[in-house]
């Protein structure tokens, strides 16, 4: 736990083990609040952009309920608890609590992204394709793209953390370490 990394725009430091989870886990569980106020959770593939201290989630337009919930109440959490495919041994479980934004702008290509974010997204996509080579059949097949155009049209969700909690070796029976992130209002 001695390896720490300074985070721009934040007066805190984040342990390397937490960053390793953000950079190596493929999925997280995104929880929003539904219309009734009850939590609703979905598996997502978040992209962490450390230079801006934000997570980005690209969700299909045809599966947009999470964006509807976020527009109603921006409080969200993301739990990184499933290390399958991460190549990390006994990794932390990490919970990110924060505020999300879900603009109603539709994206049909990733070319609109900031070049730095595009590089991060491209790296994650390549990593996913190495782990799940069958993805290429869907991503690069014109028939799949035509029949599933609703899936490839994306809404971008941005999550700005305000609290990060982590549990050693994913052991939820122990008390978590907690970091308050002060750049969120």
Predicted regions and their residues:
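Short, basic/aromatic recognition patches
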Residues: 2-29
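A short beta-turn/loop motif at secondary-structure boundaries
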Residues: 34-38, 86, 149-151
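Short, surface-exposed beta-strand-loop junctions and turns on beta-sheet-rich folds
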Residues: 63-65, 173-174
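Short acidic (Asp/Glu) patches
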Residues: 60-64, 73-85, 134-144
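Charged, gly/pro-rich active-site loop segments
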Residues: 1-10, 89-185
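Short beta-strand segments
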Residues: 25-62, 68-70, 77-81, 90-95
């Amino acid at each position: 736990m001695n390896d720490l990394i300074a985070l721009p725009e934040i007066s805190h430091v984040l342990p390397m083990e937490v960053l390793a989870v953000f950079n190596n886990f493929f999925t997280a569980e995104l929880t929003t609040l539904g219309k009734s106020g009850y939590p609703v959770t979905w598996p997502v593939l978040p992209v962490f952009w450390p230079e801006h201290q934000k997570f980005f989630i690209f969700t299909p337009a045809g599966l947009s309920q999470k964006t509807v919930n976020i527009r109603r109440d921006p409080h969200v959490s993301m739990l990184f608890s499933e290390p399958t495919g991460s190549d990390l041994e006994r990794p932390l479980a990490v919970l990110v609590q924060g505020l999300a934004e879900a603009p109603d702008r539709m994206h049909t290509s990733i070319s609109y992204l900031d070049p730095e974010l595009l590089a991060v997204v491209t790296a994650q996509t390549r990593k996913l394709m190495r782990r799940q080579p069958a993805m290429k059949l869907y991503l690069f097949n014109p028939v799949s793209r035509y029949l599933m155009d609703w899936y490839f049209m994306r809404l971008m969700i941005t999550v700005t953390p305000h609290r990060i909690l982590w549990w050693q070796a994913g052991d939820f029976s122990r008390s978590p370490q907690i970091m308050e992130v002060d750049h969120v209002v």
